[in-house]
A protein has these predicted regions:
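Unchanged
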Residues: 27, 36-39, 44, 69-156, ...
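Short helix-capping/linker segments at secondary-structure and domain boundaries
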Residues: 164-177
Length: 190
């Protein structure tokens, strides 16, 4: 079902609020239109994953997340991944592979997040991370622990890590060492 009418209800340099009329006489459905962005699983030459710690005004605290940023007009997700990696961490990658994209929130957002894996990442001489960003490195077990304990908890970036794992780009343990606990039977809501 396509909207009968779509109007920009509010606009900023970073996003637009859209009002979509779905049926005559009904109140509009509101959603956000944002640019796509790329998140980078950057693996250093010594097999550590880069992360950044930065203050996020939306949640009013520092967060730990993957290097990421908007895909600029005319830029590919791989180019955005390389640029953001360099800007946020001061690292350059030997290779960047785009694994695909996901829709961050199909009920509210009209954009995509691109999963990129950068390998052979090394610090570029003379480059420093953006002001206010602390660069962190994790081994895969350390990153798994940080995720399990809620230290690394950007939901979309956890999803990006999962995509990298299921595509075989990150291996936490040999496949035969991973076990899945039996699930409890589903409970019916009454």
């Amino acid at each position: 079902m396509n909207p009968l009418k779509t109007e920009v209800a509010f606009a900023t340099p970073w996003f637009e609020v859209l009002a979509k009329t779905m049926k005559p006489g009904e109140a509009p459905y509101y959603s956000l239109r944002l640019p796509d962005y790329a998140a980078v699983v950057a693996i250093t030459e010594d097999q550590r994953v880069l992360a950044v710690r930065q203050y996020r005004p939306a949640v009013e605290r520092h967060t730990i997340e993957l290097p990421s940023g908007l895909v600029d007009p005319g830029e590919s997700p791989a180019e955005a991944a390389r640029r953001e990696l360099l800007e946020e961490t001061g690292y350059e990658a030997a290779e960047v592979e785009v694994l695909g994209s996901m829709e961050p929130d199909t009920g509210r957002l009209g954009n995509r997040i691109w999963t990129c894996v950068a390998t052979g990442a090394r610090r570029t001489e003379g480059r420093v991370p953006e002001e206010g960003i602390e660069v962190l490195t994790y081994s895969l077990p350390e990153l798994a622990r940080a995720t399990a304990e809620g230290e690394f908890n950007h939901a979309l970036h956890v999803a990006v890590l999962l995509v990298a794992m299921v595509r075989g780009k990150l291996r936490l343990a040999p496949p035969d060492a991973i076990t899945i606990a039996p699930a409890a039977p589903p409970q019916t809501q009454r």
